[in-house]
Amino acid sequence: MRLTVPGNLLLLGEYAVTEEGGLGLALAVDRRVAAELEASSSLVVEGRWGERTVHWNRESGEASPLITAIVETWREQLYSQESTKAREAGEPAGRIIVDSSAFFEGGRKSGFGSSAAVTVALTCALLHLSGFSGSRLLHCAARLALLAHRRAQGGRGSGYDVYASLYGGFGCLVGGAEPSWQAVELPWLPPLYIFRGPASVSTPNSLHSYERWKGSNPREWRSFFEESNQGVRRFLQADSWPQARRAFTASKELGLRLGELIGVSARIEAHDSLVPGLHKALGAGNELGIYLAEDPPDEPALEPVVVAPEGVRWQS
């Protein structure tokens, strides 16, 4: 049995989506994590992260904090409290190989949300071992993968990346302790391209800077939060790209201002041939940029973004 899970990007709603009621527009990217299930006398997981391979079992849980968080969440939720039937059946055994090599380029992560995609893939594989299938598996995976990913991130995480990888396509996430995901259609959206920023950016450090600024400036934060949500709503309510373009540009400018306030720049240099108002930084910082191309770009540094309409994909 084999399954694949797409990557993800957050197009709009940086930082605000981590808040209760914060909106974020996300999408699934057709660069996939693969998971294969094989027979085994015990539960073992092999993780292939680019050029690095980790081996996880009960005795070597420290080999991968992410795998440990996923397995422990599955174990606690299903075999500690899910049902008497599950506890009596005992934990199933199997060998699971999770490969995220497609998310690495020259030893550097691509920025397509590999940790969330790995979390979804391994969670679905574990649930399959537990006898789940179809909509029941998908529903349970949404809950467990979110818990596991937050656990691996120290309790944080909006969930946009988990849900985008799980469901595929475009979606609007409403952030909070129990986030919600609503699929959206954007038929007028121009082709998307990404390009690299100057260096990797630590998302936890960026969020720490944001939280520190928020605590010291509650009134300014409230203004930012409301403006961010308004920008996402206007983008989603647009009937055409010219309407949505204004909301996109406003969201970009808001991100630039916030970056200056919290000390984490959202300013990203792009090639002179790109229209300035059509590109912005993605995520917390300027590690990755996105360009919405009204005309075919002639710039080799740009990488086309292929949207994955399908989330988890199973293969026999």
Named regions from a protein language model:
Residues 2-10, 16-18, 26-29, 34-80, ...:
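C-terminal nucleotide
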Residues 81-88:
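Short, low-complexity, charge-dense intrinsically disordered segments
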Residues 88-90, 186:
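Short glycine/proline-enriched loop/turn "hinge" motifs that connect secondary-structure elements
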Residues 95-97:
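Conserved phosphate-donor
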Residues 110-134:
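DPxDG-like acidic metal-binding loop motif
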